[in-house]
């Protein structure tokens, strides 16, 4: 386990990667294919909005989606500002390795090891659908994230409640 901001990460847990406005990173349209975009969206309890931090050694992490099992990666292995984030099956490449850096405000900056740039949002947009990208460090909230553990009991309870309220097929 390693500490990032105020969150102790465990490989056995899933986390939300939350922007300061409460929206989370997710796989666009719950797409399971390599190359599916990573974007910002309102949290709705879906597994494509949940992430596992997999220890990659040397203080590095791979970030794996709960629904697809794929890793956050740099599109086309790009390292320049504005390179979009997408998901890809696990590789040994550093484009899937991330370092977690705590901020003074208790949030976390997530830096790609290969590019030495941070997870950011295109145009500093914080609305639903904003594309995630990498960018050189700036001292703004658009590069700061809350890593919030998903409560598995709450997830199971929510699923059971939804199941009870689903109408029977006719």
Question: What are the residue ranges of the model-derived segments?
Answer:
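Extracellular glycan-recognition/adhesion modules and their associated mucin-like linkers
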Residues: 1-32, 50-79, 97-126, 144-170
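Generic preference for hydrophobic/aromatic residues in regular secondary structure cores
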Residues: 17, 38, 42, 63, ...
């Amino acid at each position: 386990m390693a500490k990032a901001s105020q969150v102790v990460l465990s490989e056995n847990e899933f986390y939300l990667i939350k922007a300061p406005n409460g929206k989370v990173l997710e796989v666009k349209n719950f797409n399971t294919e390599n190359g599916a975009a990573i974007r910002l969206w309102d949290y709705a309890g879906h597994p494509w909005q949940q992430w596992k931090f997999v220890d990659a050694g040397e203080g590095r992490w791979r970030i794996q989606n709960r629904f697809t099992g794929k890793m956050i990666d740099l599109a086309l292995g790009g390292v320049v500002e504005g390179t979009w984030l997408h998901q890809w099956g696990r590789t040994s490449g550093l484009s899937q390795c991330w370092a977690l850096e705590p901020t003074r405000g208790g949030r976390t900056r997530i830096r790609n090891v290969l590019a030495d740039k941070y997870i950011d949002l295109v145009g500093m947009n914080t609305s639903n659908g904003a594309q995630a990208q990498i960018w050189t460090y700036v001292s703004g909230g658009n590069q700061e994230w809350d890593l919030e553990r998903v409560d598995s009991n709450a997830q199971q309870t929510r699923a059971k409640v939804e199941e009870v309220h689903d109408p029977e097929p006719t």
